[in-house]
């Protein structure tokens, strides 16, 4: 796969030039045809080639027509789009800008005003609205040419970058949930391989549209809801935020969205606010980023009438690793690996390979596995050996090829020599609170974290934003058969459980709250 992502997008858009490929629900349902999107991307790409000398370009835009055009223009021009996390705070964005050597950022005036003081600061800011007005005539010409010229001729005429293969195509910074963000380099080969793997899982379902509300700085938002539609996947219906379940329910119902990719946290909020009337038309729902609680899966099937398919991915995997297929799912697992990917489990301490069915640290090898962290050969060497990526997750592969994730290493505490999983305790507490009617908004309101303990090494701490009596919670956990060593002894009431824009729990912020 030596092809470039830019050429793949050009071909995918030119082939459907007269069809609507993006509906921007955040802009009143504006419908963007593939040819128009391609024309704007080609015009802006020419501008970037002329005026931006550096390789990487920062982008601060939400999901929508603007975000799609800015990212498309970068890959057409041979630039690396770096979608900056504008929700992570000044320190994290400054770190990303410094590591990537970003001098220019593409955004919009409204976006800068919304982000305010946390807006990433660079030498130069390009307003997308102004750029598109200035390049309007060229964009129209290119959109017309997209209707009449063969893709190869169009690419040659527009001087579209053909660099591909193992060259850098995207740069995503980890959420920083466990520390300073790391730059994950994704090559053209990585992204295109994962797109083909996604097609292999979902291509036969005849999906006409998917919801694109995950941030573009999130790996699923970047690959699944940005590049998949542009390279030939289903139409994407965009909304600028995943945090508004009421609006998202309206969007899903109004535009008859077929595919929803989200996190369990956001799905629970959506189920509570939208209901069957708006969500019942979905053909498939896939969750990732955190374990899907069995109670949520059952409740969604009962109330909405749709089976939730749990999947699994990571930024270093471009990101899709495994997913439960429609009609061939196994509850409690994340499904089978995507095509071309290998997995093995190893002992954490020795690195010894374990037998199939035995739980251990998961390692993956395949065309969608990243080549390394930006400017950090030390970190890269720790996690990549002979093409095998040493993940931070515990799991096991059964005899039928279904993968089960036991939890992230960062979500375990070593207490009295035993590894205690935070996620299992959270699942018990969330299920209990939900059935007791104490959960207010639909999102998870409990987080288990840990602080240092001189006697046992670590002490579990429960952060909760809803009413909870510690003694009552301890009794409930014991009645559910939770081992005594796993039962937390400290409970801290907080205003809200810290959650990242990606829908994951903010582990670093949680530890700070617990230690405070």
Predicted regions and their residues:
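Gly/Ser/Thr-rich phosphate-binding loop
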Residues: 143-147, 257-261, 271-330, 342
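AMP-binding/adenylate-forming catalytic core of the ANL superfamily
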Residues: 105, 260, 366, 371-372, ...
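Conserved pre-ATP/AMP-binding loop-to-beta segment of ANL
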Residues: 17-20, 130-173, 179-180, 200-209
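Conserved ATP/PPi-binding loop(s) of AMP-dependent carboxylate-activating enzymes
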Residues: 336-340, 352-382, 418-420, 424
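Conserved structural elements of the adenylate-forming
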Residues: 37-43, 149-153, 184-205, 267-271, ...
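Conserved AMP-binding/adenylation subdomain of ANL enzymes
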Residues: 192-209, 217-258, 273
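Conserved AMP-binding/adenylate-forming core of the ANL superfamily
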Residues: 21-68, 72, 89-94, 147-148, ...
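Conserved beta-loop-beta connector loops within the AMP-binding
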Residues: 312, 344-363, 397-400, 470, ...
């Amino acid at each position: 796969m030596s092809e470039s992502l830019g050429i793949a997008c050009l071909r995918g858009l030119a082939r459907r030039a007269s069809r609507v490929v993006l509906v921007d629900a955040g802009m009143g349902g504006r419908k963007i045809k593939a040819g128009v999107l391609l024309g704007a991307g080609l015009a802006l790409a020419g501008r970037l080639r002329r005026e931006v000398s550096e390789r990487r370009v920062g982008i601060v835009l939400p999901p929508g027509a603007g975000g799609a055009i800015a990212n498309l223009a970068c890959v057409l021009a041979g630039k690396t789009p770096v979608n900056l996390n504008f929700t992570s705070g000044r320190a994290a964005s400054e770190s990303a800008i410094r590591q990537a050597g970003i001098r220019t950022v593409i955004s919009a005036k409204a976006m800068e005003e919304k982000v305010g003081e946390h807006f990433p600061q660079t030498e130069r800011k390009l307003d997308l609205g102004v750029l598109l007005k200035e390049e309007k005539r060229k964009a129209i010409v290119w959109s017309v040419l997209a209707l009449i010229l063969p893709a190869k001729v169009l690419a040659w005429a527009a001087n579209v970058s053909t660099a591909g293969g193992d060259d850098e195509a995207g740069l995503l910074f980890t959420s920083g949930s466990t520390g300073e963000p790391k730059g994950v380099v994704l090559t053209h080969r990585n992204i295109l391989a994962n797109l083909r793997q996604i097609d292999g899982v979902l291509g036969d379902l005849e999906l006409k549209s998917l919801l694109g509300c995950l941030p573009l700085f999130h790996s699923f938002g970047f690959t699944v809801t940005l590049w998949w539609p542009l390279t030939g996947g289903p139409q994407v219906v965009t909304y600028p935020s995943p945090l508004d379940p009421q609006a998202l329910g309206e969007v899903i119902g109004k535009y008859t969205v077929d595919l929803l990719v989200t996190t369990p946290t956001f799905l629970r909020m959506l189920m509570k606010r939208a209901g069957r009337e708006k969500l019942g038309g979905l053909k498939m729902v896939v969750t990732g980023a955190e374990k899907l609680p069995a109670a949520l899966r059952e409740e969604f099937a009962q109330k909405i009438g749709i089976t939730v398919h749990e999947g699994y991915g990571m930024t270093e995997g471009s990101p899709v690793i495994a997913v439960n297929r429609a009609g061939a799912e196994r509850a409690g697992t994340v499904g089978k690996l995507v095509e071309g990917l290998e997995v093995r489990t190893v002992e954490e301490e020795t690195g010894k390979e374990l037998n199939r069915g035995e739980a251990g640290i998961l390692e993956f090898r395949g065309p969608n596995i990243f080549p390394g962290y930006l400017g950090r050969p030390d970190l890269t060497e720790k996690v990549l050996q002979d093409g095998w990526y040493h993940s931070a997750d515990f799991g096991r592969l059964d005899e039928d090829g279904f993968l089960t994730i036991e939890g992230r290493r960062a979500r375990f505490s070593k207490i009295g020599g035993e590894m205690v999983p935070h996620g299992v305790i959270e699942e018990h507490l969330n299920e209990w609170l939900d059935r007791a009617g104490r959960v207010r908004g639909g999102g998870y309101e409990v987080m288990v974290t840990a602080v240092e303990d001189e006697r046992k090494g670590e002490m579990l701490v429960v952060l909760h934003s809803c009413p909870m009596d510690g003694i009552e919670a301890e009794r409930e956990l014991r009645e559910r058969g939770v081992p005594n060593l796993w039962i937390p002894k400290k409970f801290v009431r907080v205003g809200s459980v810290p959650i990242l824009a990606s829908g994951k729990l903010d582990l670093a912020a949680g530890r700070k709250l617990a230690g405070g």
